[in-house]
Amino acid sequence: ASEIKVTLGQIRTIKVHVMGEVVKAGTYSLSSFSTAFYALYHAGGVNDLGSLRNISVVRNGKQIAVVDVYDFILKGQSKGNISLQDGDAIIVPPYHSLVEVDGNVKRPMFYEMAEGETLNTLLGYAGDFTGDAYRKSVTVTRKNGREYQIHTVDDDMYSAFALVDGDKVEVGRMIERFENRIEVKGAVYREGVYQLSENINTVSK
């Protein structure tokens, strides 16, 4: 009869340096199967000043990967979450641009914006408009270092309007008013609310 022998060896450990804007920076002993996300978890995660978009994995003095947590959270992509090797360093820099979106979007909160991203990108991160949002324009409040500025951005400029650190985007609600509604009451066969159009402009119709 055939015999199969299985030997279970000890999993090799590696030392990984986690530096920068994390809760507990330091050198960690991890299993050789560890990834960048796992190392960040052991360091307590990114702190309030840290970037979630531009985390570097450095090996032998060279950057070999960039971790963008948004790619994983919002798109399910984990291309930067590579397997680590002994001596690797994970460096979390401060965030570059943090903006707030408030009002009638599905996920109103602060978002970190990467270089080249626009107002349209931010609306995508925020889950897009709610059903009762006013979509034709939004209001951006910006700090210029001395005072505040207001920018009214129309919808045809969403994909071109670049946001800067400290911007606040406010999405309003539709006005509760109808553009083509008429209500008929009194001595008619059917009272009610009807559509008003170019072809219907008298009660008899």
Please annotate each region the language model reported:
Residues 1-205:
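Ser/Thr/Pro/Gly-biased, low-complexity, turn-/loop-rich segments
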